[in-house]
Amino acid sequence: MTESVTVAELVKANRLDVYTGKDNLDRKITTSDISRPGLELTGYFNYYPAKRVQLLGITETSFAKGMSHKELLNVMRKMCQPETPAFVISTQLDPPEELTQSAEEAGIPILGTKLTTSRVLSNMTNFLEGKLAERQSVHGVLVDIYGVGVMITGDSGVGKSETALELVKRGHRLIADDRVEVYQQDEQTLVGAAPAILSHLLEIRGIGIIDVMNLFGAGAVRSETDIDLIVHLELWQDDNHFDRLGNNSETQRFFDVVVPKISIPVKTGRNLAIIIEAAAMNFRARSMGYDATKVFDDNLKRLIKQNANKS
């Protein structure tokens, strides 16, 4: 979990313009919440979230234009607290002179963007939530297969990295090998990424470390992806009764998100890459409303009923 993000990182990720305070972009942002000061402009500061990035749009700036210079300067100075990381002005609006004066006095950057207020609010919130979210490190491999984020787990040496290499060779994209940094982006979305030091790398026993981006090109890698499906690889054991029809619904919980999970037995001669590829396509088909197991079950019940009527 990252405890803070600098204003410079926010500027770079969201392509913001720096109006003032270029020397103060190292200020820390410690919360993903964004504040749109409304009541504060009227002078109400009983609850002012000073630690948040302050976002001003058309509504706020037009209201400010109706205030006297003295009133607005007083309000802006109250808004420029030592813990306030930055001000952001949307829709290519000019910041009020009183804000510029107050922010320069406090050493707080003023940033700008051509995006609408709602759009920049969404973009900044998503970025900050991703950066500041609690993270869990998982032993596994994460691959994007036909747009489905598949996290492959299993004991060490079961063949996760080798399977990922075959999937990359078949045109899919690697996100992480060995360690997957997992975090919750929102109520229903789980995201996985690689630790910076392991980005784009695969470790293959007998070969060593290979750079997937260097060998297969930029189209073979991604920096992060949603985790839609977990595939757990297990060594084949005759006394293990693996699901053959797809009726069993396994899941695994990370934070507040429950992710579908399937277990695949590993045995000599089984092409795991093709099996996992098929699992991803089957998951996507189910997400679109087609369930082959249900179709088979319905056909079987209909056949049994027909045979029963004949007898």
From Swiss-Prot:
Residues 202-211 are annotated as: Important for the catalytic mechanism of both phosphorylation and dephosphorylation. Residues 265-270 are annotated as: Important for the catalytic mechanism of dephosphorylation. It catalyses: [HPr protein]-L-serine + ATP = [HPr protein]-O-phospho-L-serine + ADP + H(+); [HPr protein]-O-phospho-L-serine + phosphate + H(+) = [HPr protein]-L-serine + diphosphate. The keyword Magnesium applies. Its EC number is 2.7.11.-, 2.7.4.-. The active site is at H139, K160, D178 (proton acceptor), R244. It comes from the Bacteria. Mg(2+) binds at S161, E203. Its cofactor is Mg(2+). One of its GO terms (biological process) is regulation of carbohydrate metabolic process. GO terms for molecular function: ATP binding; magnesium ion binding; phosphorelay sensor kinase activity; protein serine/threonine kinase activity; protein serine/threonine/tyrosine kinase activity. Keywords: ATP-binding, Carbohydrate metabolism, Kinase, Magnesium, Metal-binding, Multifunctional enzyme, Nucleotide-binding, Serine/threonine-protein kinase, Transferase. Coiled coil: none annotated. ATP binds at G154, D155, S156, G157, V158, G159, K160, S161. InterPro entries: HPr(Ser)_kin/Pase, Hpr_kin/Pase_C, Hpr_kin/Pase_Hpr_N, P-loop_NTPase, Ser_kin/Pase_Hpr-like_N_sf. The keyword Nucleotide-binding applies. Homohexamer. The Walker A ATP-binding motif also binds Pi and PPi. Catalyzes the ATP- as well as the pyrophosphate-dependent phosphorylation of a specific serine residue in HPr, a phosphocarrier protein of the phosphoenolpyruvate-dependent sugar phosphotransferase system (PTS). HprK/P also catalyzes the pyrophosphate-producing, inorganic phosphate-dependent dephosphorylation (phosphorolysis) of seryl-phosphorylated HPr (P-Ser-HPr). NCBIfam families: hpr-ser. Belongs to the HPrK/P family. Both phosphorylation and phosphorolysis are carried out by the same active site and suggest a common mechanism for both reactions. This is HPr kinase/phosphorylase. It comes from Levilactobacillus brevis (strain ATCC 367 / BCRC 12310 / CIP 105137 / JCM 1170 / LMG 11437 / NCIMB 947 / NCTC 947) (Lactobacillus brevis).
